[in-house]
């Protein structure tokens, strides 16, 4: 994500629609190079043909942090300039429950979303005197095109990973996007 390009987009939006009052930062995603093959490390994994913590690719980890964290920081820098000193302006960041209770196998994603949660708290204090309210939501697990093949077999049955995730989910099911609407509207009002 290029800061200058994002600032140009912010200026174009401002010209077309006026000042930005609401910014929702929804950047998110993972990279296979930033995941482990197994949930738990075992002594023999160092020499095995298994991708472990020790094999995480720094480029993959950087990709995940750039996508999630810089994908929140840079748009906020670009659009929040228009909010300074005005009333009723809001920044809403999308974090994840992984920030608080990390799933196994996805250390970079969990770490990047933890960075979003921490950054949101910092930014809320930082902007508190200039009329910009900053919050985040941290949804649980949702099925998306990006993760569908990890959660369901080709015949539509649940994978072992899905069974484990749902066993640790109080409602025993994945979330639905429309269930976030009330929280979003409340935080942006």
Q: What do these predicted regions represent?
A:
Residues 96:
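Residue(s) in the substrate-gating loop at a strand-loop-helix junction
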Residues 102-110, 122, 150:
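Active-site loop-to-helix junction immediately N-terminal to the catalytic Tyr of the SDR YXXXK motif
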Residues 136, 158-189:
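C-terminal helical subdomain
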Residues 81, 125-126:
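Alpha-helical segment proximal to the catalytic Tyr-Lys
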Residues 40-73, 92, 116, 171:
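Catalytic Tyr-X3-Lys loop
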Residues 36-41, 129, 141-168:
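A glycine/serine/threonine-rich, flexible loop-to-helix segment
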Residues 76, 112:
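Active-site helix of classical SDR
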Residues 21, 117, 127-143:
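Conserved Rossmann-fold SDR core element
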């Amino acid at each position: 994500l290029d800061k200058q390009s994002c600032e140009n987009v912010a200026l174009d939006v401002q010209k077309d629609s006026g000042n930005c009052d609401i910014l929702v930062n929804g950047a998110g995603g993972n990279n296979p190079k930033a995941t482990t093959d197994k949930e738990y490390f075992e002594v023999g994994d160092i020499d095995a043909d298994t991708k472990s913590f020790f094999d995480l690719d720094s480029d993959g980890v950087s990709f995940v942090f750039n996508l999630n964290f810089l994908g929140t920081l840079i748009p906020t820098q670009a659009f929040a300039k228009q909010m300074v000193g005005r009333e009723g302006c809001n920044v809403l960041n999308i974090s994840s429950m992984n920030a608080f209770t990390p799933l196994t196998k996805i250390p970079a994603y969990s770490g990047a979303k933890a960075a979003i949660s921490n950054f949101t708290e910092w930014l809320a204090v930082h902007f508190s005197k200039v009329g910009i309210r900053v919050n985040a939501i941290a949804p649980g697990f949702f099925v998306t095109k990006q993760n569908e093949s990890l959660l369901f077999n080709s015949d539509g049955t649940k994978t072992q990973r899905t069974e484990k995730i749902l066993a640790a989910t109080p409602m025993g099911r994945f979330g639905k996007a429309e269930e976030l609407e009330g929280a979003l509207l409340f935080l942006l009002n």
